Design a protein with these regions (language model features):
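Short, contiguous alpha-helical
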Residues: 117-123
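Residues at or immediately preceding the N-termini of alpha-helices
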Residues: 13, 84-85
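Conserved beta-strand-loop-alpha-helix junction that forms the acyl-donor binding cleft
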Residues: 10-12, 106
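Vicinal oxygen chelate
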Residues: 1-5, 27-82, 88-115, 126-129
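Conserved active-site tyrosine of GNAT-family acetyltransferases
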Residues: 16, 20-21, 91, 119
């Protein structure tokens, strides 16, 4: 088995792809003509987005929608960078909301937390040495 995708269910797939492309520099890989699913080239694991309407057809018992008006889910997308301060501010300029400022952890790694335009938690960090 291989971990292949992280799929976030979002209000607007096209806006979310545009946000992540602007915030991270990732390129769009694919999107459906209907705009209900799309993928970004983000490294070894594909970062994908599907519409809330598609989620409703996939999950007959319902699902929890992410929202900026609620606390973030207990899961995050983590992106490593050697230019954390620059990339953290780039994401904010693209529309991310700062959740926790960049700090240096006791083990030497720098870490900061953001929320994306849908309320999902993003960690921007330096690689662990």
């Amino acid at each position: 088995m291989k971990f292949a995708y992280t799929i976030l269910y979002v209000e607007n797939v096209h806006q979310t792809i545009a946000f992540y492309a602007s915030a991270s520099g990732f390129q769009k890989k694919f999107s459906t003509p209907e705009g209900d699913y799309g993928e970004l080239i983000s490294g070894e694991t594909t970062l994908a987005f599907a519409s809330l309407q598609l989620a409703e057809t996939n999950f007959s018992k319902g699902f929890q929608k992410s929202s900026l008006q609620q606390k973030p889910f207990g899961i995050e997308l983590a992106f490593t960078t050697d230019n954390i301060e620059t990339d953290f501010q780039k994401a904010i300029a693209a529309g991310a909301i700062e959740e926790e400022a960049v700090v240096q952890k006791p083990w030497g790694q720098k870490v900061g937390y953001l929320r994306d335009i849908n309320g999902f938690l993003i960690e921007v960090c330096t690689p662990i040495q």
